[in-house]
């Protein structure tokens, strides 16, 4: 730690996005992250935009009120679409290494990333919990009102929207420098108590509690398959519930678990609380991959809707069939005119 102090002056003269520990361990620039981010976001943007736009259109227009998870699916799609719409600006920056817009727009895009992540976590958890609860308590499902889901969704947006504000606030240093954004934003130094409190809240509310809930739902749904079916509830209904809960769990663990495991170490490295060079290197090199995996939820969630709601599949099939028929008819009419 004594040697680490020698680099303090260098750190003060250097980039705000670089911590003292990074300079000490000679990991001042993870160069591959720019091409990784740009490539990932390019691959996600078009499919994510088309899939989530189509999903939102089908969910809002065609899915019946009988589908209890519809409200949570719509909100999940909105969260994904908000992040996807910000990807062109991220792609431009990571390719050009220059931010020509206002700093406020940069921080808004940065904020939308974390809003998407934690809103997605909450809505995936709600879908799993609701599906499991209605499977175990089918009579309660009959009395459940859609306005309850609307109220829960509104509360989630308010709480998550407020809770995500520290992310752009902590990165809003050096406001006069409008040329850098996203991965190159600086970090505000925090005292250890405030930092530990922020990490604890983020990990507990944004990861640990949802993991416990989703794991419990998966366990209870699996057990229900071994029990005799209740009135008006066949084995197929339980299998559909299990498939839904399993898919929510899969999206959650693939997209969000790596980030939250690395988040603790990465934040402590940036705040110069951890100075062990092996830990510094692992946290910094792993971080870009974690963020890319988190953005992958924008592609996986529409697949979730497809397998969760039979009406969703039916509407896509009907729309695809109608498009095919219209094309065939136009070709036939064109051929008859030529003939």
UniProtKB/Swiss-Prot annotation:
The chain crosses the membrane at residues 40-60, 69-89, 104-124, 150-170, 194-214, 245-265, 289-309. Disulfide bonds join 106-181. Keywords: Cell membrane, Disulfide bond, G-protein coupled receptor, Glycoprotein, Membrane, Receptor, Transducer, Transmembrane, Transmembrane helix. This is Putative P2Y purinoceptor 10. One of its GO terms (biological process) is G protein-coupled receptor signaling pathway. The gene is P2RY10. The keyword Transferase does not apply. It is found in: Cell membrane. Belongs to the G-protein coupled receptor 1 family. InterPro entries: GPCR_Rhodpsn, GPCR_Rhodpsn_7TM. Putative receptor for purines coupled to G-proteins. Glycans are attached at residues 16, 26, 178. Pfam families: 7tm_1 (PF00001). Weakly expressed in blood leukocytes. Residues 61-68, 125-149, 215-244, 310-339 are cytoplasmic. One of its GO terms (cellular component) is plasma membrane.
